[in-house]
Amino acid sequence: MKRSYPDDLVIGNLSRRGFLKGVGATGVLLVAANWGWRDALAAEKKAFGADAMPHGWVDNPKIYVSIDRDGTVGIVCNRSEMGQGVRTSLAMVVADELEADWSRVKVIQAPGDEARYGNQDTDGSRSMRHWFEPMRRCGAAARQMLEQAAANQWKVPLGECRAEQNKVLHAPSGRSLSFGELAEAAAGLEVPARDKLLLKKPEQFRYIGKDVARAIDGADIVNGRAGFGFDARFDDMLYAVVARPPVYGGKLKRYDAAAALKVPGVVKVIEIEGRPIPSEFQPLGGVAVVAQNTWAAIKGREALVVEWDAGVNGGYDSVAYRKQLEEAARKPGKVVRDSGDAAALFARGGDIVEAEYYLPHLAQAPMEPPVSTAWYKDGACEVWAPTQAPQVTRERIAERLKLPFDKVTVNVTLLGGGFGRKSKPDFVLEAAILAKAFPGRHLRVQWTREDDLHFSYFHTVSVERLQAVLGADELPQAWLHRSVAPSITALFGPDSKHQGAFELGMGLTNLPFAIPNVRLENPEAPAHTRVGWFRSVSNIPHAFAIQSFVGELAAKAGQDPKDYLLKLLGPARRIDTAELGDSWNYGESPERYPLDVGRLRGVIEEAARQSGWGGELPRGRARGIAAHYSFVTYVAVVIEVEVKDDGALLVHKATIAADCGPQINPERIRSQLEGACVMGLGLAALGEISFKDGKVQQDNFHQYELARMPLAPKAVSVHLLKPDGDLPLGGVGEPGVPPIAPALCNAIFAATGKRIRELPIRNQLQGWRKA
């Protein structure tokens, strides 16, 4: 069987015993971190971080380090790479503690197997904060084993041996041995006990924290050798596209495949059974056209005659639904936080300010649409997919095909963007289901851009209504916020009409303002389409509404927006988020990860200073500021804009300040924040998915527009605050998105006097001078 695919992205479905045996036969060093995590944590009342994740640590994280005889250092990455640099950053950590020569490092992608690799969900901006320490320990353990092997061979004290750049040196004699020469002997040694590990001090780091551009896959991506989902190619390939019900919950009534089967290259037409609401991560169902090439499959689908039953969501209309959300926002809802007595102050009246904000559904729209290749034979299934959740994918395939778990192999390719869409494996299941109909042949299911936009797990639509009772100092004495949005939890329960704790904890319940009376409510909002994870999730609507409202209050008070925001935050202090009603805190310990107002103030001050806040600007330009805490990271943004007479929006500069704790790979951190800025601008200015008769109205990028060069900032500067003291790692992939929209809209107000309360902005600036 001929295969065109990078070997380092494929691992065979070996048992642990088989893998170890194979490694021993080739004489390489293999290290598995194994220190009985459950025993160590047994006394804790509640687990946090990776320990709280499904299979987060199990009994052995099984993060492997291997060294070949030629000195090549193999590092297994258990997280999915989608441009955030995790394959590079995790490898950097191991290589640093190991003292590996970076030019000799090879990264091997782990297949979906949580029992071996621990939790593999690549979401929540938590890969580095959950795996930094385990990877350090693995690197350190391997280093000490190599040093011990050298000491044994030279018959010298261990303390005289020191690993450095793929060698172990014996300073007194000047002798050295390469890692490759020591690998076989080191492999026979016991892994050092956890309390015997000698981790490097920060000043000894060679790669960690160094501001050097490294990208383990960079050259391959540039020259086309990198393996994305589309690059899994075999000589016996079949290709399929699927006609899916255009309305969520719809069903197939009838179809006629006669014309489709006449299309040259079409092999077969197969019905896929969908799952009734709630669909969870299952395929929507429909009719698949299988062909000898993608084009034939697409033309065959066009020739299908299909009749659908729209079902309960056939009347879903974005315009009408917005009105429902607005009506709900004007009535009391489920109370999710009630500090002081806000109700009494609002009943008393006085200087009350209110505003309402709207955000539509959004689609992740990764540049690489969903795609998956599957192979089925003799009761076993193997897939190649750009998935963010390989273990969930494996579980769902086993369930759907009624296979033993160990008969399913999920190979993780590079992802051409993910943004949360590829954490749902419906597209991989489609390939597995269809491959079973063609035993022994590889079958790829390809989604078109239209498929991607029509059948995504969309970011929620939202109405946010805020009110404040102002005191004599123009600061809020009482605060009321009603957040109305369908929840991701509706994927799992049909009657779910309130946001989950994890959604509420994304900028709503953990509001850090020093306001004595706060009431937060979450009215009902039923879901009429698939709502799913999206880069930064519910932080987007919460940050947009709250930071825009702060801008409005500052303008009413006639005060500088930055100074007003700092007054609202109050003095530097550390808040236990549970005291605010946030029971989630991004899954982290409130003791280790308190909401630190001082750090939030710090990024605001830094962004303002670096942007030249308060300084003069050319005529027609203005600045806006916003700040937000998400994924245990603090980000502030200043946007400098110009609005032309015809309403054209120019973003001259974006200044970003972030405090994410220790910085493992500063270059990748900056690149993610830069990318978040461009994405956030595109969402704010252009992003909207709308529905009519239950169907998505946008087909491609001419209707669902992304940020293009004219909208991108002429300059983006990212400033990373150095951690003060022993701070834990924060997230990076998502925190840069939420403050972008409010900073942009606050800047637009400063430039034009026009307040933007609904997104996208699109044509709202046309005729602003006349207004």
Where does each model-flagged region fall?
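N-terminal secretory signal peptides
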Residues: 1-14
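Molybdopterin (Moco) oxidoreductase catalytic core of the xanthine/aldehyde oxidoreductase family
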Residues: 2-3, 132-212, 264-350, 414, ...
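N-terminal export leaders
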Residues: 14-35, 564
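Conserved beta-alpha junction segments in alpha/beta enzyme cores
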Residues: 43-89, 93, 120, 217-220, ...
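Thiamine diphosphate
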Residues: 87-92, 395, 418-438, 445
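C-terminal catalytic domains of large/alpha subunits in multi-subunit enzymes
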Residues: 95-122, 144-176, 261-263, 400-409, ...
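Glycine-rich loop/linker segments at domain edges
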Residues: 114-117, 126-131, 182-231, 333-372, ...
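Short glycine-/aliphatic-rich beta-strand segments at the starts of folded cytosolic domains
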Residues: 238-246
